[in-house]
Amino acid sequence: MSLETFKHSEALTFGVELELQLVNRHDYDLAPFAPDLLRALKGAEHAGDIKPEISPSMIEISTGICHTYQQALEELTVMRDLMVAASRSLNLGIAGGGTHPFQQWADRTISDSPRYQYISELYGYLAKQFTVFGQHVHIGCPSADESLFLLHAIGRYVPHFVALAASSPYVQGVDTGFASARLNSVAAFPMSGRAPFLLTWDAFTAYFEKMRNTGVIESMKDFYWDIRPKPEFGTIEVRVMDTPLTVQRACDIAAYIQMLARYLLLSRPFMPQEDDYLVYTFNRFQACRFGLEGEYVHPNELTRMPIADHILSICDALVPHAEALGSLEALANIRALAERRDGDAEWLRQVDADARSQRETVRKACDRWAA
């Protein structure tokens, strides 16, 4: 399959995708309820989409094309409320979070679709281990070349996105010590990591064709990059976030990405360069391991500061962009979170410490999602 033509989209529109956990109300383990929930929701009126994912123990909700933070918040809230109402008759719980705290990957099944069965055959047990839950945000780009500029410019802020959304401290019943352990599962795939440093669509097309000719990839879906262009939508897709525990936080983070994109496209505070990636993996690891307390190394100035402080350092520059986009509330929420440094991973650990039961932690995560 050749690379699709980069579709025209309205610049700075955005869309949000959230992968959610489906658990039974008996022991709060993951359970394959997606087909039942989708049947229960058939005919329900809502914007956006609700659809199955790689495992029937997870489900994805996504907005339509959004112009404002408030629009995304309303669309996701409606879908959340419909799903929570439908789940009651199924004795089903729905939760955010990047990983389920104690599920065993060997117990998972793969959804019966050609794409997911292909992934299972190709990647073996990695497909079942990929029962992790992420937030993806699409940002509309004014042109194909601008999409690559934005992809690499916003890459500096990947540690922000990871740390703000981090909600996966537990894997198979064990506290990993990470704020976001989910990204370690993604890293096992061969086409993960960062996109190649290319700033023109012609150069990117040539790269894609070389990769396709090797037989390693067939389409853009085979790249599991942290940020990837989506030519069929005319967007870039930011893919590093855990699914937060609430719709509110998911929308705050999406709006933060949108306002950063506006700042980068209009103000051009720097030009992306290959050397930006010298500290990319280190900064990303720090965000995964320590969350907002992680260390951020500036790729040009070589200064060091906590990720939370780096977020706070950019907030003032984002005020006019947040105001223009109608997302000052979201910026205030992001600023407050960075000041407190108490994200979803910290909340999960505190609940688990108080309850001394991961089942109770999942139950409370379900309540938090529904609230």
UniProtKB/Swiss-Prot annotation:
Catalytic activity: L-cysteine + L-glutamate + ATP = gamma-L-glutamyl-L-cysteine + ADP + phosphate + H(+)
Spans through the membrane: none
Keywords associated with the record: ATP-binding, Ligase, Nucleotide-binding
Gene3D superfamilies: 3.30.590.20
InterPro entries named among the record's database cross-references: GCL_type2/YbdK_subfam, GCS2, Gln_synth/guanido_kin_cat_dom, YbdK
Listed GO biological process terms: modified amino acid biosynthetic process
GO molecular function: ATP binding; glutamate-cysteine ligase activity
EC number(s) on file: 6.3.2.2
Role this protein plays: ATP-dependent carboxylate-amine ligase which exhibits weak glutamate--cysteine ligase activity.
NCBIfam families: gshA_cyan_rel, PRK13516.1
Family: Belongs to the glutamate--cysteine ligase type 2 family. YbdK subfamily.
Designated name of the protein: Putative glutamate--cysteine ligase 2
Organism of this sequence: Cupriavidus necator (strain ATCC 17699 / DSM 428 / KCTC 22496 / NCIMB 10442 / H16 / Stanier 337)
Native organism taxonomy: Bacteria, Pseudomonadati, Pseudomonadota, Betaproteobacteria, Burkholderiales
